[in-house]
Amino acid sequence: MAKVYYNGDVNEQVLEGKTVAIVGYGSQGHAHAQNLRESGVDVIIGLRPGKSWDKATEDGFSVYSVREASAKADIIMILSPDEHQPAIYKESIEPELTAGKALVFAHGFNIHFNQIVPPEHVDVFLAAPKGPGHLVRRTYTEGAGVPALIAVYQDATGQAKDIALAYAKQIGAARAGVLETTFKEETETDLFGEQAVLCGGTSALVKAGFETLVEAGYQPEIAYFECLHELKLIVDLMYEGGLEYMRYSISDTAQWGDFQAGPRIVTDETKAAMKEILSDIQKGKFAKGWILENKLNRPEYNAINEAEKNHPLEVVGRELREMMPFVKASKSKGVVANAKN
């Protein structure tokens, strides 16, 4: 079982006299920066010129170029998207990594897959809230917090874990609980969850269900409601109380159908495919493919993305959502991983 730390387990004094630079001011960046500041930490922001720079300035932060912020800071938290981090690091952060500084991540991808290789004289650790930035911020203001993961990759000062815990506490996470992990575990399980269950698995299941009903002659609007729209109702129940609470809350007919049909959908072959997906992640095959795809300017990614936008499920969904003004689509990118970024 994971080791869990709470407020009373943390020595926040290790942050005294230190300046934290938050690189990025998106979903996670604004939450980390504001929570740290309100916890008494000296925070600056590192950005490129643009809307985020203006927003951070409006919020009362001192904003600098990434390189200047990295030079001024003792602790540098990188909250830009995974695919942008290596270039930002190489150009603007690495030259300013003097001995004793700390490099921090909210997702382990670039460290675990060697896209960023820090010098030996700096601490490297993970501080990853398990929720989107707006929730990290809101729960903090309410006196609560979102659980977070910490992991130490490199301990040059002998204080990396203490600093990681203090950072997590000052963004509110130790109010809920901070779980200790490793960069390997966080990275591989995060990618697997996204691919096999949360994004890849769920998207494929929803599309297959929709297509099955439409091909059998049912109206696409009805198929959309049954296979996509109502998914939120079930996921919310799982979120609140696990599978047991979901099953308690649905009808007995639905629960019996769950027991009878579920194993016919997710079969031994499905689990074998999941193991292959996990193996590809563990061996670095997925990472290599994604890195290459980005270097080539994402030809396959963009082609698939455009095709998916025109799937009949999406076409009918856009029409039906016009009937439901209470359904609002957030335009924030990276809500799941980079809940996380």
Curated annotation (Swiss-Prot):
It is an enzyme of class 1 (oxidoreductase). Substrate binds at S251. Mg(2+) 2 binds at D190, E226, E230. Binds 2 magnesium ions per subunit. Residues 182-327 form the KARI C-terminal knotted domain. The active site is at H107. Its cofactor is Mg(2+). Pathway: Amino-acid biosynthesis; L-isoleucine biosynthesis; L-isoleucine from 2-oxobutanoate: step 2/4; Amino-acid biosynthesis; L-valine biosynthesis; L-valine from pyruvate: step 2/4. GO terms for biological process: isoleucine biosynthetic process; L-valine biosynthetic process. Belongs to the ketol-acid reductoisomerase family. This is Ketol-acid reductoisomerase (NADP(+)).
